[in-house]
């Protein structure tokens, strides 16, 4: 659900023209009078603690190099799902990912199967819009469904310090405190991230913004994730008919384990 992680890992969207971002300076507001950096750290830690292992609905969008990625999904206790759309260079890729227990499932159009999963053009045409299954213990394919269980949500929200306060805002009708941190790209550079939590009440995240000052230009990623329905636990059903993805992908694409 994190835009940067979705682009560099989960959706393998480098093939769609979205690459690792470079650092963009972020102008931040001064902390409230009398507040120290440790206070921002404390609020960030309180937000992760409040999340715990709660389910949630999320919507995210990211842009870079003229490519866009839109994702919507739900994380539950034993199952979860997300649907994504990648648009780049006149090509639209659509894919749905689902996890039920210890098995992951993906279904996508031919473009998504070829560019995001790595199937051949012939395989992508044959298996387009059908369900492909794999064990979540598979190192590599597991990223396709990472963050879709409620026990994984807090980890998806992790950002690095030092933490500072940004400018307070009204987000989704709520007065919110902005906590600024960063995440690292694959190249080792850092991208600023702003996490918005309610100013009062339980600090369950409302929104997360990556590179708030960027506009999805040639070298800078910009993304947002919004959260709602904290505590939900939607149950996803396993598809009735599937094909093993492990039998289709090149052996070098992942570390194969039993199952799938």
What are these regions (language model features)?
Residues 75-82, 140-156:
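Short, basic/low-complexity N-terminal boundary segments at the transition from targeting/disordered tails
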Residues 174-241:
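Gly/Pro-enriched, hydrophobic low-complexity segments
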Residues 2-74, 79, 234-237, 241-243, ...:
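N-terminal leader/targeting segments and the immediate start of mature chains
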Residues 107-149:
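Acidic/charged, solvent-exposed loop-and-adjacent secondary-structure segments enriched in E/D, K/R, S/T
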Residues 150-191:
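A mid-sequence, solvent-exposed acidic-amphipathic segment
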Residues 54-62, 67-88, 93-97, 102-106, ...:
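One face of beta-strands
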């Amino acid at each position: 659900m994190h835009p940067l992680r979705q682009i560099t890992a989960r959706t393998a969207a480098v093939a769609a023209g979205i690459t690792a971002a470079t650092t963009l300076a972020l102008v931040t507001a001064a902390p409230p009078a009398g507040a120290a950096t440790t206070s921002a750290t404390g609020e960030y830690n309180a937000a992760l603690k409040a999340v715990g292992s709660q389910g949630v609905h999320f919507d995210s969008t990211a842009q870079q190099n003229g490519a866009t990625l839109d994702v919507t999904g739900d994380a539950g206790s034993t199952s979860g799902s997300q649907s994504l759309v990648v648009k780049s260079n006149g090509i639209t890729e659509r894919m749905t990912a689902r996890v039920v227990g210890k098995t992951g499932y993906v279904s996508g159009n031919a473009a998504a199967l070829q560019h995001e999963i790595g199937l051949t053009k012939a395989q992508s045409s044959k298996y387009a819009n059908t369900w492909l299954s794999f064990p979540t213990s598979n190192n590599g394919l597991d990223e396709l469904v990472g963050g879709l269980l409620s026990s994984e949500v807090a980890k998806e929200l992790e950002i690095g310090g030092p933490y500072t306060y940004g400018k307070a805002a009204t987000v989704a009708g709520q007065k919110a405190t902005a906590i600024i941190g960063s995440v690292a790209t694959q190249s080792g550079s850092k991208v600023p991230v702003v996490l918005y939590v309610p100013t009062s009440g339980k600090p369950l995240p409302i929104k997360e913004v990556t590179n708030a000052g960027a506009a999805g230009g040639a070298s800078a990623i910009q993304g947002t994730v919004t959260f709602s329905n904290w505590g939900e636990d939607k149950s996803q059903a396993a598809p009735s008919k599937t094909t093993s993805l492990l039998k289709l992908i090149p052996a070098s694409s992942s570390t194969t384990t039993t199952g799938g």
